[in-house]
């Protein structure tokens, strides 16, 4: 019966996804171990995470990225609910993880760590386009993992760096960001799992609120509430002052190089407020996003603002990087202000590019939210060449 309901919910929007879902359902029925894994996930969630989440707005719609770019490429609100609220989402994530490991045995991109005074930021390419991160206090030999979706890849980096994992920072609940919490927290018994209690993050042990600070050695990491992509989405700001270097923003699915995440669980006004939280940070802040979407996003930005020279220069650099499969992160927030359309809703040039409408400086912010909503609609329709 469940297979019929799932297939019906997806009818007309992705027959192939329905077949995948039926396969997962039938496989899970025959596989008792999968059910045990599900019960284990539920039993280890924090008390806060056991509460029933608020219902999603009926206006929400999930539109897929181009094929192969998104672990949640099945479409529809029904699928989103299954993905985030049931064990089917975990099984789907495991399937995507196996495929990515086979396709990219050394990761989807070549990354380079950034070294500061006793602090190292190490990007780890996982799945088909995700990034996890290790933030390391090199003097103390302590590490913090951000969004460790592939525990095998993250553990390999931990062993290579010869550090002790003491904390996991989860930006949000989606499996492509939280899927490694179980294995890593079991392997590293003293490891704490941080995140928002509103998001149902698996294996959460230490709930965080807006402006809470996580301290690990010399690392001072502040949580900033940025709802919109999910209700409890957080970004993490590593303070650069203790090591006399630039601050680092680990943005999850809020902000990408020249892009932003979809508003799955909120409104345009909510997402605008979250993006404004980032805009308040300094220009030299390094942006470490959750996905490698740079080339696609800059292509869309060129459609919106074709005469933006900052975007053109960045696109040329990104294309050279991607020809060699090199990572494009980090960028800086100063750069993003110059070419990221989702951070430029206050700019008259962008409003004029999208046509007439209310002024971008209205006191209630309504017109900026409308512009953001229109940008999101156009981005979802955009296809990269």
Swiss-Prot record:
GO terms for molecular function: hydroxyacylglutathione hydrolase activity; metal ion binding. NCBIfam families: GSH_gloB (TIGR03413). The keyword Mitochondrion applies. It catalyses: a thioester + H2O = a thiol + a carboxylate + H(+). Zn(2+) 1 binds at residues 172, 174, 229, 253. Residues 32-56 are annotated as: Disordered. Keywords: Cell membrane, Cytoplasm, Hydrolase, Membrane, Metal-binding, Mitochondrion, Phosphoprotein, Zinc. This is Probable thioesterase PNKD. It comes from the Eukaryota. It comes from Mus musculus. Zn(2+) 2 binds at residues 176-177, 253, 291. Induction: By Hepatitis C virus core protein. Its EC number is 3.1.2.-. Its cofactor is Zn(2+). Isoform 2 interacts with the sarcomeric proteins, MRLC2, MYOM1 and ENO3. One of its GO terms (cellular component) is plasma membrane. One of its GO terms (biological process) is regulation of synaptic transmission, dopaminergic. Probable thioesterase that may play a role in cellular detoxification processes; it likely acts on a yet-unknown alpha-hydroxythioester substrate. In vitro, it is able to catalyze the hydrolysis of S-D-lactoyl-glutathione to form glutathione and D-lactic acid at very low rate, though this reaction is not physiologically relevant in vivo. Belongs to the metallo-beta-lactamase superfamily. Glyoxalase II family.
């Amino acid at each position: 019966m469940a297979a019929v309901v799932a297939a019906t919910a997806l009818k007309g929007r992705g027959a192939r996804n329905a077949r995948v879902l039926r396969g997962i359902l039938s496989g899970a029925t025959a596989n008792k171990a999968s059910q045990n894994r599900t019960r284990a996930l539920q039993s280890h969630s924090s008390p806060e995470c056991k509460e029933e989440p608020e219902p999603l707005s009926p206006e929400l719609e999930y539109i897929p990225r181009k094929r192969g770019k998104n672990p949640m490429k099945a479409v529809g609100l029904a699928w989103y609910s299954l993905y985030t609220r049931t064990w089917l989402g975990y099984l789907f994530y495991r399937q995507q993880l196996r495929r990515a490991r086979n396709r990219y045995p050394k990761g989807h991109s070549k990354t380079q760590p950034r070294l500061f005074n006793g602090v190292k930021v190490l990007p780890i390419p996982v799945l088909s386009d995700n990034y996890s991160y290790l933030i390391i206090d090199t003097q103390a030999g302590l590490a913090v993992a951000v969004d460790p979706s592939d525990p095998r890849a993250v553990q390999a980096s931990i062993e290579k760096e010869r550090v002790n994992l003491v904390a996991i920072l989860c930006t949000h609940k989606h499996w492509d960001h939280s899927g490694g919490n179980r294995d890593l927290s079991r392997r590293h018994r003293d490891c704490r799992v941080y995140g928002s209690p509103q998001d149902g993050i698996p294996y959460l042990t230490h709930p965080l609120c807006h402006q809470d600070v996580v301290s690990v050695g010399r690392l001072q990491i502040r949580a900033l509430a940025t709802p919109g992509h999910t209700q409890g989405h957080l970004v993490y700001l590593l303070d650069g002052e203790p090591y006399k270097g630039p601050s680092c923003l680990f943005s999850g699915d809020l902000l990408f190089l020249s892009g932003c995440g979809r508003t799955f669980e909120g409104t345009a006004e909510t997402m605008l407020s979250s993006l404004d939280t980032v805009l308040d940070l300094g220009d030299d802040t390094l942006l470490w996003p959750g996905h490698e979407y740079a080339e696609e996003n800059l292509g869309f930005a060129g459609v919106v603002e074709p005469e933006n020279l900052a975007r053109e220069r960045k696109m040329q650099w990104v294309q050279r990087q991607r020809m060699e499969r090199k990572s494009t992160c980090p960028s800086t927030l100063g750069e993003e202000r110059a070419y990221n359309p989702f951070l430029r809703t206050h700019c008259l040039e962008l409003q004029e590019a999208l046509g007439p409408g209310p002024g971008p400086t209205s006191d209630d912010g309504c017109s900026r939210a409308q512009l953001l909503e229109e940008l999101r609609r156009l981005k979802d329709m955009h296809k990269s060449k």
